A protein has these predicted regions:
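Catalytic glycan-binding domains that act on GlcNAc-containing polysaccharides
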Residues: 1-134
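Low-complexity, Gly/Ser/Thr/Pro-rich intrinsically disordered linker/tail segments
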Residues: 115-162
């Protein structure tokens, strides 16, 4: 179903499906991390409710619905200039050069070999944090945001290699 949503959103907006899949991967491991961020970002594409409610972005859809949020992400990337310069669009999505680089890296992998999608969809989550890179294993779920320090105390196996 995710692949259909990426391709549908791509057809509707012109944003490459691989970029949408890569954003979804970086944001929530393609929906496997289900929670609200410390910044209050929500859903599979991690929208702030204020961004979601901008005219033409959420369009009355459900912030937690993969189909709705993937289409909203495509519209948001267009609004932020992604059709002219995808790096600029990604900067508008998350103002981090590392974020954009990671998304474009995964998008390039998907473009080179579309079957990579299957392995990325079922992979452990690699998460860049203030403490370094963490591994979030499949099924990771917290009802409330958790600080990196608390996460590492509870799950030391997620710690970055030293």
């Amino acid at each position: 179903q995710l692949l259909k949503a990426y391709r549908s959103a791509s057809a509707a907006t012109g944003i490459d499906w691989t970029v949408l899949a890569a954003v979804n991967l970086v944001e929530t491991g393609m929906g496997r991390i289900d929670g609200v961020s410390v910044a209050n970002a929500q859903g599979p594409m991690q929208f702030l409710p204020t961004t979601w409610s901008e005219p033409g972005i959420g369009n009355g859809g459900d912030i937690r619905d993969p189909w709705d949020s993937i289409h909203a992400a495509a519209r948001y990337l267009v609004r932020r200039g992604g059709l002219q310069d995808i790096r600029r669009g990604l900067w508008g999505y998350n103002n981090s050069a590392h974020y954009g680089k990671a998304v474009l890296h995964y998008a390039a992998l998907l473009k080179k070999e579309p079957l990579t999608y299957r392995s990325l969809h079922q992979w452990q989550i690699h998460y860049a944090s203030s403490a370094g890179d963490l591994w979030l294993h499949e099924g990771f779920e917290e009802p409330q945001p958790v600080s990196v320090t608390d996460h590492l105390r509870r799950r030391p196996y997620s710690a970055p290699p030293r």
